[in-house]
Amino acid sequence: MADQVSSDEEVWSEREFVGHDFRDDDFSRLRTERSVFDECDFRGVDFTESEHVGSAFRNCRFDRATLHHSIFRQCSMLGSVFTDSRLRPLTLVDVDLTLAVLGGCDLRGVDLTGCRLREAGLVDTDLRKAVLRGADLSGARLQNIRLDEADLRGARTDATLWTTASLRGAKIDVDQALAYAAAHGLNIHGE
């Protein structure tokens, strides 16, 4: 059975919420540790300066939520949807965003090093100057994504990234440069 919400708590440890409606709640400065939120509604929730360690936010809605100055470490946001949310500045360390929908979000300059964004919806997302070193973008939907001046070195990507994204000034490694060339039909020879 899911725990009941108590507004006077600042640390939620090992709690579970399923299908809970948190709409317009104030979670600023809240800390969660190993807590699970399944199919919860966070529309309009203020997460300002909150910190989350080892918590899971699976298939949750974050419409008009405020997550700026928040920290997420070793968290899962599997299948969660972010619409019209204020997300930066934001700290994400080893976060699983597999199947998450971040389409149209402003993630300029956010450090997503090592994050998993497999099959994530990133259509029209602004990731200019973001750091995606070692991130996994396999199978992500990337139409009209903006990655100008982003650091993509070591990121796992599909060929669609190289043909659909805006990449002016992006930092890539040699293997990615070859993948970019191949995606654009270039025939590369050593001699």
Give residue spans per PLM region.
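Tandem repeat scaffolds
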Residues: 1-191
